[in-house]
Amino acid sequence: MRKIEKILFPVDFAEKFETFLPWVHTFVDKFGATLYVLFVAQDLSEFSSFYVPHASIQNFQEEAVAAAKKKMAAVVQESLKKFPKLETRVAVGAAAAKILETVQKEGIDLIIMGVHGRKGLERTIFGSVADQIVQSAPCPVVTIRPEKP
């Protein structure tokens, strides 16, 4: 069996990612792995076809990234401080592409992802980042559905 030394946990601050942390902690403890937590901010330049001055989009993007980094720092203090080996990353772009890029760049051995459980038209329109990762990742992917109350 391949040694698991680096685990990637992509997060979406809009979702309750904390509900997945017991599972993440179990895997990290089991393998003694370093946990990489990644947040991917949407690239706002794709909205440049609308009439918005380029400088405004760039400034807003910089503010969004700064806010994401600030949120990540808060999340580390509130929810992730129990992980002894922790790396955090904030990237800008398409979520699936940036996750796969991080896997390659960091030599990730396992990905743990929460899934939204979208169905029907919403899934057709928005697709599933988790589906794209499962299909394309060069390493195993564990997907976790949120528990229903």
Predicted features along the sequence, with ranges:
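Short beta->alpha linker loops
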Residues: 67, 90-94, 116
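A short acidic, glycine-rich active-site loop
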Residues: 55-70
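Small/aliphatic-rich secondary-structure junction motif
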Residues: 2-54
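Gly/Ser-rich helix-loop-strand patches that form or flank binding pockets
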Residues: 3, 102-149
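Structural beta-alpha unit
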Residues: 2, 30, 77-111, 149
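General small-molecule cofactor/ligand-binding pocket signal
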Residues: 36-38, 87-91, 142
